[in-house]
Amino acid sequence: MFMTDGSTGFYYENYESTSLVFTIITIVSVVLMVALSILNKQNIKIAPPKPNAFLGISQIMLGVCLAIEPLFVNDIPSTVPNALKTIKVVLIVVAGISFVVLGFLNFIDKTPNYILLIIPTLSYVIRLLVTFLCYTGMSGIASNIYEIVNLCFVLGFLHFSSKILCGVPGKNTKAITRTFAYLSLISTSICSIPNMITTIFGNTNIHLSVDSIITNLFMTIYVFAFLISKKQEIEETIE
């Protein structure tokens, strides 16, 4: 399933791996949605889906994607300490679980706890640090600057959007969140959609692994859902 590009040292996967990830995410997401539907039909006090339903579904799908991401990650270079590798994997899985919980809360229009939103932010801090350590020298960083910039945009979006989702935006938070949201939407789209197409059609001249491509794809969907669901909140002027 996994192959290595010897000229660059980067890993890439064929379309079978991509299809497998999509299959797992789709199955789990459908099961979760069916479970919600069953609970809503019973006499359980769960509010019906509100305008945040799309946001909740996108969070659940992103959460499932993050939770299973370590299963498809290739060996991280020896330049990254083993302890940091372990922390990255644990945080990614926990962040995935957090997003699933957040998705359920948004689906039923409940305000999430701020702690649930801190974990995904921390996972991207570690992800960014590991990405820096994976590349040796400034030339390696420069040649993959698009991936690093993308992670920075997503990290900024996760940090500032957490305040919006908790309903406690500070001064200028809305404008900053809106800026990072649009930057993240553009960068994740660039890092996912073209690479996804080339991966499926067997193009091996790509440097992003399939786990990174798919994570960016579902992050794109999440950011898009956030912009739609929270449009009023992030465009209001703080008096």
List where the protein language model places each region.
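Juxtamembrane "helix-exit" motif on the non-cytosolic side of transmembrane helices
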Residues: 2-10, 68-79, 128-140, 192-203
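C-terminal transmembrane-bundle signature of multipass membrane proteins
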Residues: 1-2, 23-24, 30-34, 144-239
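Alpha-helical transmembrane segments of multi-pass integral membrane proteins
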Residues: 55-71, 87-101, 115-131, 147-158, ...
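Canonical alpha-helical transmembrane segments
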Residues: 27-45, 97-106, 155-164
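Membrane-interface helix-boundary motifs at transmembrane edges
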Residues: 42-51, 104-115, 165-175
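Transmembrane helix-loop junctions in multipass membrane proteins, especially transporters and channels
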Residues: 41-45, 74-78, 107-108, 135-136, ...
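Transmembrane alpha-helix entry/boundary detector in multi-pass membrane proteins
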Residues: 12-23, 80-91, 112-117, 132-152, ...
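N-terminal topogenic module of multi-pass integral membrane proteins
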Residues: 1-86
